[in-house]
Design a protein with these regions (language model features):
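Alpha-helical transmembrane segments of multi-pass membrane proteins
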Residues: 1-441, 445-456, 465-720
Length: 720
């Protein structure tokens, strides 16, 4: 083998680095989301550490290391990502979580920070070191475009090829690609294919080994019988009976469950006198088996995850066999919003899909969805909403979550009745006076419907509705003054996620309550102070390279988080699509960087114009365009955001470097990633749940306008 020319090494290294970084980021985000039950709390925490690590690495790379050493950077990113995956899977053991419990975001933060930091530092250091091999005034733009191009390919490869195999398979194949690129850049010829083939060969065994090891580290009872990575979540099935199905590490269903699912299913069917047409959102617990004991004409169970719908008949086993051959029963895999809009004339809708602990789950707990449910109901129709909050203590975050969901339901329906229990059931009718939970009436309906189930004794009905407990619960809801939960302002998500995460972590619940009370006015004051600081820097004629880099990074990551939240809220899970959505953004950065290199002179004026255009993108998000037209708007907005980010980088690096290209690339990239890290932490965890989509996007727009004005002010000061 002979060494290749330095530019070739740099070009291949930057492409491979983008590929490795995209795969690593997608893998780590998926692992973090799965580790805490699919919660977007992972977005802010993991992305903040990832981006801060990249920024710190870029700062180091601006000073030390050459293109030859940087060629090993992409492989180092993938190798350290593999170690990070093992650490995250082992988090229950490392954090001392109870048997069968997942590590919480609070307790596992140090594990994630340690795991994510290594690949992030390696990736950040590699970028300026590799970019140093690209000489000429267009070097920074070319380096940014090459890295973004590799990231685009990596994101697409992850979503459409690597994600179904799981994290271990993605890491093995990704490492093989990076090793092949390293050998190819050194003229290895066909020998470069060897590590790629090796990665493909070990991907399957590595995935199986990691699945079984992770099951063992979780401390769950029994053996792992089956597992599956879907585009929505990670599914696991415990061996033996009853069937225990885990989704993202949490127990999703145990079937059969005569003292939970069976009682809840029969009670739901008694809420309507003649439930002929029934729609159930959420199928994992097999409640439909008990519901089919009633004289229904058509029962549709909706499972949002097509991967779970495929395995459900096999995983629930013989106790559910009768349902699959019942001509009245239909299992639909797909979007609950679309399916509710399609169904008409329903007598009963049961929302059995769990609390809004994520933006994806929040989709079926908003005013918008409840309106769709009301439109789908026949006259006299009833909707029942399961809430994972008990009625025994309502003073804390649980009571607040229940009050918000009840207020949201009451915004659409004339009256809401609460049924007490370990999990409160909220019931609403299409017309006033439709709903009754009188035990005598419910027992009369049981007899009239002629249902028979050896696992259910109708004499427990008075205990299930318990009028003595229902009265104070109803009084609590009437006295509550709670806001409603909407797609634009998902108030319920942070409370629900914190409740699930709060085992042994009261500070997390306190933080969630504090954030809920945080008004948009407080955030507006914070944005105004930041704008004043930017203008003050401009007034003294600062070079403004680092400051503008921070704002560009903050805006780009803010757009990414808000647009992914819109996708999660309207289209579905980003668990599998995160790579493709990231690829859309990276495709824009490639176009923006190449376009700026060819047509835009780097400098303060160009950067101010880019920031002004970015404010227009933020305004479109604030106006609700991605929520109103999700499939038509989200990907184009990601592309446009990427174009502006890529177009800004040459000017950022010029201003940050003061004439030294490598210093400018390193410092500009570090500033960009630092701003992105702050946005990941603030926009995802604070701004979106507390102030909503519009306020968050308008805040980003205000910062961009202030930065553009400060840039022009600083440039005019320096010309004097």
């Amino acid at each position: 083998m002979r060494p290749a020319a330095a530019p070739v090494v740099s070009v291949v290294t930057l492409l491979a680095l983008g590929f490795a970084a995209a795969v690593a980021q997608a893998v780590l985000l998926r692992e973090a989301m799965a580790a805490i039950g699919g919660s977007e709390l992972a977005w802010g925490s993991v992305l903040a550490v990832w981006l801060a690590g990249i920024g710190a690495g870029a700062w180091l790379g601006a000073r030390r290391g050459g293109a030859s050493l940087a060629a090993f950077g992409p492989l180092a990113v993938m190798a350290s990502t593999g170690a990070a995956v093992v650490l995250v899977r082992a988090a229950p053991v490392l954090t001392g979580a109870g048997a069968g419990q997942t590590a919480t975001a609070w307790g596992g933060a140090w594990v994630w920070g340690f795991a994510v930091a290594a690949p992030a530092l390696a990736g950040g250091w590699c970028f300026p070191a590799a970019a140093a091999g690209l000489a000429g005034p267009g070097g920074p733009a070319l380096a940014y475009a090459l890295e973004s191009g590799g990231a685009m390919v990596g994101g697409l490869a992850f979503t459409f090829a690597l994600a179904p195999g799981g994290a271990a398979a993605a890491v093995c194949v990704g490492a093989g690609v990076c090793a092949a690129a390293l050998l190819a850049s050194r003229g290895a010829g066909w020998l470069a294919l060897a590590p790629l083939l090796a990665g493909l060969a070990v991907a399957g065994p590595a995935a199986r080994g990691l699945a079984h090891a992770g099951w063992g580290w979780s401390g769950r009872l029994g053996e792992l019988a089956a597992w599956r990575e879907t585009h929505v979540q990670r599914l696991e099935l415990a061996a033996g009976s009853p069937a225990a199905i885990y989704a993202d590490g949490r127990l999703a269903a145990s079937f059969p469950d005569p003292f939970g699912t069976v009682e809840r299913a029969h009670l739901a069917m008694l809420l309507h006198p003649h439930p002929a047409r029934v729609l159930v959102i959420g199928a994992a617990d097999g409640a439909f088996v008990s519901m089919l004991r009633h004289p229904v004409e058509r029962l549709v169970a909706v499972e949002e995850d097509p991967g779970l719908a495929v395995v459900l008949p096999r995983w629930l086993g013989p106790p559910a066999a009768s349902a699959w051959t019942d001509p009245r029963f239909f299992l639909e895999a797909g979007d609950p919003l679309r399916l509710v809009g399609r169904e008409k004339g329903l007598d009963l809708i049961v929302l059995d899909d769990g609390d809004p602990t994520t933006l994806r789950r929040n989709r079926t707990r908003t005013v918008e969805f409840f309106r769709a449910c009301r439109e789908a109901l026949a006259p006299g129709g009833v909707v029942a909403v399961r809430v994972g909050v008990g009625d025994t203590y309502l003073a804390g975050a649980g009571g607040r979550l229940l009050a918000i969901l009840a207020a949201t339901l009451a915004r659409v329906f004339p009256a809401v009745v609460a049924v007490p229990g370990d999990e409160v059931l909220l019931v609403a009718g299409r017309e006033p006076g439709t709903v009754t939970v009188d035990p005598a009436v419910l027992l009369a309906r049981w007899r009239a419907q002629g249902a028979r189930d050896g696992d259910f004794d109708p004499r427990v009905v008075p205990l299930l509705v318990d009028p003595a407990r229902a009265a104070p619960l109803q009084a609590f809801l009437h006295a509550s003054r709670a806001p409603v939960n909407t797609a634009r302002h998902p108030r319920a998500v942070l409370l629900a996620a914190a409740l699930r995460e709060a085992r042994g972590a009261p500070p997390l619940l306190n933080a969630a309550r504090a954030l809920e009370r945080l008004t948009p006015a407080v955030l507006g004051i914070a944005v105004a102070l930041a704008a004043v600081l930017l203008l003050a820097r401009g007034a003294v004629g600062a070079a403004f390279g680092m400051e503008s880099g921070v704002i560009v990074g903050f805006a780009s990551m803010g757009w990414w988080v808000l647009l992914l939240a819109c996708w999660q809220e309207t289209v579905g899970s980003v668990y599998g699509e995160v790579g493709a959505l990231s690829a859309a953004f990276m495709a824009g950065t490639v176009a923006g960087a190449f376009g700026a290199r060819r047509w835009l002179p780097a400098g303060a004026g160009t950067l101010a114009g880019v920031l002004g255009a970015g404010a227009a993108v933020s305004a479109a998000i604030a106006a609700g365009v991605p929520l109103a037209f999700p499939r038509a708007a989200i990907v184009p907005l990601l592309l446009l955001g990427g174009v502006l980010t890529g177009a800004a980088f040459p000017s950022v690096s010029l201003l940050a470097g003061g004439g030294a290209p490598r210093r400018g690339v390193g410092r500009g990239f570090a500033a960009d990633e630092a701003g992105a890290a702050v946005a990941a932490l603030l926009v995802g965890l604070v701004v979106l749940p507390s102030a909503g989509l519009a306020a968050g996007a308008l805040g980003i727009a205000a910062l961009e306008v202030a930065a553009a004005a400060a840039l022009l002010l600083a440039a005019s000061r320096r010309r004097r």
